[in-house]
Amino acid sequence: MIPWNAYVRLLRLNKPIGILLLWYPTAWALWMANQGFPSIDLLMIFLFGTVFMRSAGCVINDIADRHIDRHVARTQFRPLTSGEVSLSEAFILLFILLCASLLLLLKLPINCFYFAVISVLITFLYPFCKRFLNAPQLILGLAFSMGIPMAFIASGKNLNSDFIVLFLINFSWIIAYDTMYAMTDKADDLKIGVKSTAIYFASYDRLIIALLLIFLHSLWLVWAINKNAEWFFYLLWCTAAGILTYQLKLIYARIPKNCFKAFLVSGYYGLVMWFAVGLALI
């Protein structure tokens, strides 16, 4: 019998937050690059590409961490670690996902290919960075930001000031929310020697997260003022600021389950700012 349930969990399709956190910045970029009206074709290419590459990243991560995950309470029952999915099955799934992503890539301009290659290389590198890099979230930030330049190029736009602002917003956002995520596993990671910004930032973790959130949310104001955005953008911006404040409240006591909840709440921030960008460009 084919272990469909195990495959779904290996690809994290049962946990769509990862897909959403990769999709929202790409959607922001598509809306910015197309003045609020991206084509259906572009939307479908990038949406499916997001799902395929995020799932591929999960498979790569689980292959690399299969001997580590059994020592972490949250990950010890992942399909590869528990034996529900074999290593050969995981490689076959990875091959299928990469081929599907390549087929989508062929529909985009050639310059998108270069960023896609960078994205794949970083995706393969990231799990191993947790062994030797004190801040592997920096690598994750690059990997999860490659959809932004690809969206601009696919839309026929240069990598302009909008791109720079958005890239900085997303890069900072990723480091902030993934540090929250890493705070969930901090005790286990310290025992087994896995590195993360949650460990590297030490007692300054909450302060640095707060500074990153203030920085990136302020950049949205810079963008909005430059675009002469109407009042409804600022209303949604204030709503999103409330979400960030709630996240900071959740992580204040550094309770693992609350840190994980704070990470999940990031999805609401991405959604609200997607609406804000869309309305600002109408």
Curated annotation (Swiss-Prot):
User: Reaction catalysed?
Assistant: all-trans-octaprenyl diphosphate + 4-hydroxybenzoate = 4-hydroxy-3-(all-trans-octaprenyl)benzoate + diphosphate
Which InterPro entries is this protein grouped with?
Answer: HB_polyprenyltransferase-like (IPR006370), Prenyltransferase (IPR039653), UbiA_prenyltransferase (IPR000537), UbiA_prenylTrfase_CS (IPR030470), UbiA_sf (IPR044878)
Q: Does the keyword Magnesium feature in the UniProt annotation? A: yes
Q: Which GO terms describe its molecular function?
A: 4-hydroxybenzoate polyprenyltransferase activity
Q: Where in the cell is it found?
A: Cell inner membrane
Q: Which UniProt keywords apply?
A: Cell inner membrane, Cell membrane, Magnesium, Membrane, Transferase, Transmembrane, Transmembrane helix, Ubiquinone biosynthesis
Provide the topology term for how it sits in the membrane: Multi-pass membrane protein
Cited Gene3D superfamilies:
UbiA prenyltransferase
Q: What does this protein do?
A: Catalyzes the prenylation of para-hydroxybenzoate (PHB) with an all-trans polyprenyl group. Mediates the second step in the final reaction sequence of ubiquinone-8 (UQ-8) biosynthesis, which is the condensation of the polyisoprenoid side chain with PHB, generating the first membrane-bound Q intermediate 3-octaprenyl-4-hydroxybenzoate.
Gene Ontology BP terms = ubiquinone biosynthetic process
- Transmembrane region positions? 17-37, 40-60, 90-110, 113-133, 135-155, 163-183, 207-227, 231-251, 262-282
Q: Which domain of life is it from?
A: Bacteria
Recorded hits in PANTHER family, A to Z, give: 4-HYDROXYBENZOATE POLYPRENYLTRANSFERASE, MITOCHONDRIAL, PRENYLTRANSFERASES
- EC annotation from Swiss-Prot or TrEMBL: 2.5.1.39
For activity, the cofactor(s) needed are: Mg(2+)
Q: Provide the family line.
A: Belongs to the UbiA prenyltransferase family.
Pathway(s) annotated for this protein in UniProt: Cofactor biosynthesis; ubiquinone biosynthesis
Protein name as annotated: 4-hydroxybenzoate octaprenyltransferase
Intrachain disulfide bonds: none
Which is one Gene Ontology cellular component term of this protein?
plasma membrane
